């Protein structure tokens, strides 16, 4: 068993699969503790109502899909940063009082949350995508 740690920092559920799912799975399978920090729950996506499969919202569906993907990819943990998705145009508004929109959040605030996870996990490798 390896004592190495990898951290993926991504914006939405499904970024882990579309972006570099095979890489995450490869390292997890080799014994690396692979963790994911996800900025949003993907609430601004679209899905036909009949495809919600009993989930109360798109965010709930997307988070459930992420949980399934995390299991298949053998991720050690998945953490939500506490932001709402803004949508593809980045104009998702101010968010709710409980959950601000990631695209509108102060850079210093988002950075501090990510740095907290980096310090907690102390990964040797961090993967992310461009803004």
Where do the protein language model's features map onto the residues?
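Active-site rim/loop-helix segments in enzyme catalytic domains that contact anionic ligands
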Residues: 1-120
């Amino acid at each position: 068993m390896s004592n190495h740690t990898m951290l993926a920092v991504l914006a939405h559920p499904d970024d882990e699969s579309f972006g570099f799912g095979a890489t995450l799975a490869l390292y997890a399978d080799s014994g690396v503790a692979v963790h994911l920090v996800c900025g949003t729950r993907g609430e601004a996506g679209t899905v036909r109502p009949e495809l919600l499969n009993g989930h109360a919202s798109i965010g709930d569906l997307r988070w459930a899909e992420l949980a399934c993907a995390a299991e298949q990819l053998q991720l050690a943990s998945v953490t939500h940063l506490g932001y709402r998705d803004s949508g593809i145009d980045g104009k998702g508004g101010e968010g709710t009082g409980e959950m601000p929109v990631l695209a509108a959040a102060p850079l210093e605030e988002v950075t501090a949350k990510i740095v907290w996870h980096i310090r907690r996990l102390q990964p040797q490798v961090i993967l992310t995508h461009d803004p």
